[in-house]
Amino acid sequence: MKKVVNIEKTDSNFENYTLFDIETTGLNRSKDFMYMFGICEKKDNELIYSQYYIEDEKEEKELILELSKLLNNKKIISYNGDRFDFPFIRKKMEKYNIPKFNFENTDIYRQLQKLNLFRRA
């Protein structure tokens, strides 16, 4: 597993939240695998962007374990996390017998859906 980190100064005010997203090889929770996840957290006056990724499906369990450790008891902001990311992760946790972790998720995709910005005429 590899990790890439970028840090930049900020005055934004989203303390105590973790921005989160995953990347997978496809949409099928049983056949495809997760090869990357990214998080962004604010610490003091810095935004810390971290990406965790694997190059081989055999490392997927290690990636899921790291994800569960980092996101446990966090307030998360995701985009379509309720419908895709977290169901995908839960399926993989079952596969690898990894215990569930606690988190609170705000899915901005669901919030945007309520605004009907994408409705067809």
List the model feature ranges, each with a label:
Residues 16-25:
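Two-metal-ion RNase H-like nuclease active-site motif
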Residues 22, 35, 79-81:
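Long, contiguous hydrophobic alpha-helical segments, chiefly transmembrane helices and signal peptides
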Residues 10, 27-31, 117:
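Hydrophobic, well-ordered secondary-structure scaffolds
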Residues 24, 28-43:
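RNase H-like nuclease fold core
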Residues 15, 32-34, 47, 71:
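Short connector loops at helix/strand junctions that flank enzyme active sites
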Residues 47-121:
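Conserved DEDDh/DEDDy metal-dependent 3′-5′ exonuclease domain
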Residues 1-15:
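N-terminal accessory regions of nucleic-acid-interacting proteins
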